[in-house]
From Swiss-Prot:
The keyword Nucleotide-binding applies. Acyl-CoA ligase; part of the gene cluster that mediates the biosynthesis of communesins, a prominent class of indole alkaloids with great potential as pharmaceuticals. Communesins are biosynthesized by the coupling of tryptamine and aurantioclavine, two building blocks derived from L-tryptophan. The L-tryptophan decarboxylase cnsB converts L-tryptophan to tryptamine, whereas the tryptophan dimethylallyltransferase cnsF converts L-tryptophan to 4-dimethylallyl tryptophan which is further transformed to aurantioclavine by the aurantioclavine synthase cnsA, probably aided by the catalase cnsD. Signal peptide: none annotated. Coiled coil: none annotated. The gene is cnsG. CoA binds at G376, G377, L378, A446, I447, F448. Its EC number is 6.2.1.-. This is Acyl-CoA ligase cnsG.
């Protein structure tokens, strides 16, 4: 039963404080690597099946020491930046861990970065504009992986499949370091995401946990349906990186045989995880939110003037506490835009996400503030329209954007991907489907289908799998001109 609504006078400010336990770990990645090597020794830690490489905990520690010695012999000194430009390969981890040992910030590079952008420890993916370089400390990532892995309740017997790119904080910290922290084995199916490779691992290995962003799960589910049978040992699925529609969660639980679904939230600037849904059986009541804040993390919802709103009211989600980045590398202006100090001297990081904190202290993300569509003065959230669209039996994936309109400012546009071998619904049928639950003003006026002329064969995505909505807006604007 839903909790009763409090009168406005009885509602509390929308601010939550994470637990003060467990104790913050004051160690470095290098020391942690040696400690875990002593504990787990010959237990398998990581595997790259496509490279036929498997490393134990002791082998990871030994190899990273040898690489560290080689880097020092090459003339590198404490504080020098070491660039890593590769996909999900074992060499990535060797260099990353070696850099951590000798105090050299690892600069995680992507192939599409310009030289001027290659400047810091972890690069923010960014669905628009140039990625910014978020500077994270050992304290940040060690403790974030510690708290997140505890919330996921990993066991040493777990075998984890992660198709997430190591060049992003979700894949590097929330997947690899969390697995490492708990003594698990983690598999990286291939260098770059391949749904076929993921399904091969799920069906041929005793995988108990899978990570992914929504677009990855859509692709993997499609391949699983084509092969006709579920993974044989799946227990948990962990998603993040973008809002996860409840219809997708339901499909993951049903088609993958998942018992527990965990919905994480964060951003590179917060190390990255700040929220995670409670560990419970797949159910609508527990999975409509991103859960509660992690330990040593605080969150609040503010209005456009920076004032804390009341519980149940929408506003921008802000984060403070242990997970905050030091700032953007050599960019005080960008740092000051996103990180502000309140009257009490507390630094808050503005996420750019619209959210609600309920009376049970659970948080719900309602969309990116910059993605909100303003149609004739009405604010429309793309997320709720996307959730409705993918409930249609013939629509596999959807992305909703605002498109310019001379009279109303913006109209609702959507880009849709149909299931293979399914009949495409008419545009009017799509609008009627949305109007049925959400009202006439949220029905898309401009409808585009992936695969049609001028659209492309797939959604434009970042390296981490997020839809690039700015590119979709450009495509839609051009086609409507």
């Amino acid at each position: 039963m839903e909790s009763p609504q409090l009168p406005p006078s009885m509602k509390r400010p929308a601010i939550v404080y994470g637990d003060k336990t467990p104790t913050i770990l004051e160690t470095t990645l290098g020391h942690l690597l040696d400690e875990l090597s002593d504990i787990h020794r010959d237990k398998a830690a990581v595997e790259f099946p496509w490279q036929s490489i498997r490393r134990t905990y002791s082998e990871l520690a030994k190899t990273s020491k040898l690489v560290a010695i080689s880097l020092l012999s090459a003339g590198l000194c404490h504080g020098d930046r070491i660039g890593i430009l590769t996909g999900n390969r074992y060499e990535f981890l060797d260099v990353f861990l070696a850099a951590a040992r000798i105090g050299c910030p690892a600069v995680i590079l992507q192939s599409n970065m310009s030289p001027g952008e290659m400047k810091a420890a972890v690069l923010k993916s960014g669905t628009t504009g140039n990625p910014k370089a978020a500077v994270l400390t050992h304290r940040n990532v060690v403790n974030n992986s510690h708290f997140f892995s505890r919330a996921c309740d990993f066991e040493q017997s777990d075998i984890i499949c992660s198709p997430l790119p190591l060049c992003h904080s979700f894949g590097l910290v929330s997947a690899f370091l969390c697995s490492f922290m708990r003594g698990c084995l983690i598999l990286f199916p291939t260098e770059k995401f391949s749904a076929d490779a993921v399904v091969d691992v799920l069906q041929n290995r005793d995988v108990t946990v899978i990570y992914g962003v929504p677009t990855m799960f859509f692709a993997v589910l499609e391949k699983l349906q084509g092969r006709g049978h579920k993974p044989r040992s799946m227990v948990k699925a962990i998603a993040g990186g973008a809002p996860v529609p409840y219809a997708l969660i339901t499909q993951i639980c049903q088609d993958m045989g998942v018992q527990y679904f965990l919905n994480g939230y964060g951003m590179t600037e917060t190390s990255p995880a700040t929220f995670i849904s409670p560990l419970g059986l797949c159910s609508e009541s527990s999975l409509r939110t991103i859960g509660k804040v992690l330990p040593h993390t605080n969150a609040r919802i503010v209005d456009r003037w920076g004032r804390t709103v009341q519980q149940g009211e929408k506003g921008e989600l802000c984060i403070s506490g242990l997970p905050l980045q030091k700032g953007y590398w050599e960019d005080e202006e960008k740092t000051s835009e996103i990180m502000t100090r309140d009257a009490d001297g507390v630094i808050w990081l503005h996420t750019g996400d619209e959210a609600i904190i309920g009376e049970d202290d659970h948080c719900t993300i309602t969309g990116r503030i910059k993605d909100i569509i303003i149609r004739g003065g009405l604010n429309i959230s793309p997320v709720e329209i996307e959730e409705r669209l993918i409930l249609h039996p013939f629509i596999q994936e959807a992305s909703v954007v605002g498109l310019p309109d001379k009279t109303r400012g913006e109209i609702v546009g959507c880009f849709l991907k149909q299931y293979v071998d399914m009949q495409r619904p008419s545009d009017e049928a799509v609008r009627a489907w949305v109007r049925e639950l959400l009202g006439w003003h949220k029905a898309p006026e401009a409808i585009f289908w992936i695969g049609d002329a001028g659209i492309g064969e797939d959604f434009p995505k970042t390296a981490s799998g997020k839809h690039q909505k700015e590119k979709l807006k450009d495509i839609g604007t051009y086609l409507l001109a």
